[in-house]
């Protein structure tokens, strides 16, 4: 994923309405997004990204710097499918690439 411009976004809100609003705003930003997500909400986030950001490349990095570190790459739908019945374990860093052919609609300064 491109690193010339990225936005560290931390954790998304837990409440659905606030979460959807924040995610929609973040997806308008140019560059790569870096999010944190818990194992309890990672499949929810992947489902949301599969709907809102179908063609974007997503990287899931689990348990970074630990013995069972794992990094997966694909679309959100592909990554969601890879979990199937398995319960996700560990904390996740989620990287979301920008839309292909899109420079983004607003800058981070405009968003705040």
Go through the PLM ranges and name each one:
Residues 32, 36-112:
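A contiguous loop/helix-start segment that scaffolds small-molecule binding in enzyme catalytic cores
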């Amino acid at each position: 994923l491109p690193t010339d411009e990225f936005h560290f976004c931390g954790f998304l809100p837990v409440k659905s309405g606030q979460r959807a609003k924040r995610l929609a705003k973040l997806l308008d930003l140019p560059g790569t997004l870096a999010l944190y997500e818990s194992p309890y909400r990672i499949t929810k986030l992947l489902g949301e990204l599969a709907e809102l950001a179908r063609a974007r490349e997503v990287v899931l990095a689990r348990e970074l710097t630990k013995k069972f570190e794992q990094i997966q790459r694909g679309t959100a739908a592909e990554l969601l499918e890879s979990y199937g019945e398995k319960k996700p374990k560990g904390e996740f860093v989620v990287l979301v690439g920008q839309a292909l052919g899109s420079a983004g609609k607003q800058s981070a300064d405009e968003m705040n």
